[in-house]
Amino acid sequence: MEQVRTYTAKRKSSYIKNSYENKGLYVLSVIFLVVYYIVPQYFGLSVAGFDLTAQRLMMLIMFFYIISFNDIKNRFFDIIRHSIYLPYIIVFMCVTMYTMVLRVDINTFMQSAIEFICMYILVYIIKDVLGIKRTLQIIKVLLFIMCLQGIVEYVIQFSLFQYLETLPGKINIQIRSGSYRIMGPCNHALAYGLVLISSFPLICVDLEKKALNLLQNKILFMLVMLNIFLTGSRSALAIFIIEVLFIIILSDRENKKKTIIFLFCFLLISVIAVLGFYNTSFSQTVLRQFASIFDELFGTQWAVKFGAEVERLSQSSSYRELLPKIFKQSWLNPLIGRGVSRHFSAVIDGYTIMSIDNFFVAQYIRYAYPGLIAYVLLLINTLVKMLKNVKINKGLVLACLFGFFSYYMNLWFMDALQTLKYVYMLMAIFEVILIENNKTADTKQIKKSKYIK
């Protein structure tokens, strides 16, 4: 009896210790996810010229916590070793490393290194701590808060997140055609558009049925749509419409019918409201957004009727058309990029190019062809893997696929603007889906082998 009591006491102590470790890890994981998703990049400290943002600080805390416990550390590095992204990330990081050395620019390496470390911390958190269901619940709550703030921001023409600004000079307030463009926790209205279109498909996932349903979160769907309008981003609105259409097409018959009826009623009420308040700033903004997209597609000038600065929009389109010509500039080294800290300017066809509103062109400038090719291969690999594994969890994988593809499609019209972490979050979720599927397959194989034996 004495031996049994001693053994029980030891088991109990071990359990309590693990419980405290797990509780601490859980709390840190939730804080990390909140900071990662919603806390702006301009909140932090400047240490010896390096911006220690809240996200980077939480990354350090999480990383040191993980490596402090052998079992947690082993699981974390095991995730990295078996990652589907690792070979491509290694090649890309090698390019950033030699560019850092040759251009004497440590940010060239550190910027990408931090982003990928955060992605793998997310993979670990989702897989071993929060789980996919709880992670999606937290993301939906954060997106809801973000969208409510967006409405308040439009009314007061000031982002509440700006009260957190401790790293000055990073916010770019935008006014287009007399209308304020909301930017949420981002530093630019276009960046906020990227966040919304990459996150939107996640709110349409029905985890129970493993399917997509546009009406899974009706209120949040309408809030996201409203916020996209208020960003003033034509490309984000156009891509959002495409996302909505694909989600409807890929919904099951019952949800498709309900969605079409709901959207018909919603659009009818919206049209009546917009026309009823035709002369208000909001109605003009909505009409201008649609007219701008129509003008871009068909070469018309309907947007001018709703206060658009047509000349400015035309110059913006012409400017973007010139950007791919940067690939032909002989003075740029095709093997060694300029790094991330150097200012770029060039004169092409008489235009002075200073702002690179194309992520892929910007990647070429930063990392030359080796870096651009390595990064594009990472994207292609991810896209192919997602397409091949849709059947694992149709709703969630398609949501990751739509968010991933929409995000990078939009980057043909702008740079990433410090929003890559949102698409890396989708990649982290997809990685966990594959890990869980492989684990299930291995379990079934073991059971099958035992049965045969």
For the regions a language model picked out, list residue spans one by one.
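A membrane-periplasm/extracellular boundary helix in multi-pass inner-membrane enzymes
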Residues: 148, 154-157, 251-308, 329-332
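Hydrophobic, aromatic-rich transmembrane alpha-helices
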Residues: 12-15, 19, 58-73, 199-208, ...
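Hydrophobic transmembrane alpha-helices and their immediate junctions
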Residues: 207, 211-212, 216, 244-258, ...
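Aromatic-anchored transmembrane helix interface
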Residues: 84-93, 103-127, 138, 143
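Long extracytoplasmic/lumenal interhelical loops at the membrane interface
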Residues: 38-39, 43-45, 176, 300-367
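N-terminal signal-anchor transmembrane segment
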Residues: 2-72, 94-99, 407-409, 425
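Transmembrane alpha-helices of multi-pass inner-membrane enzymes
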Residues: 61, 199, 245, 396-410, ...
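Alpha-helical transmembrane segments of multi-pass inner-membrane proteins
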Residues: 136-164, 184-250
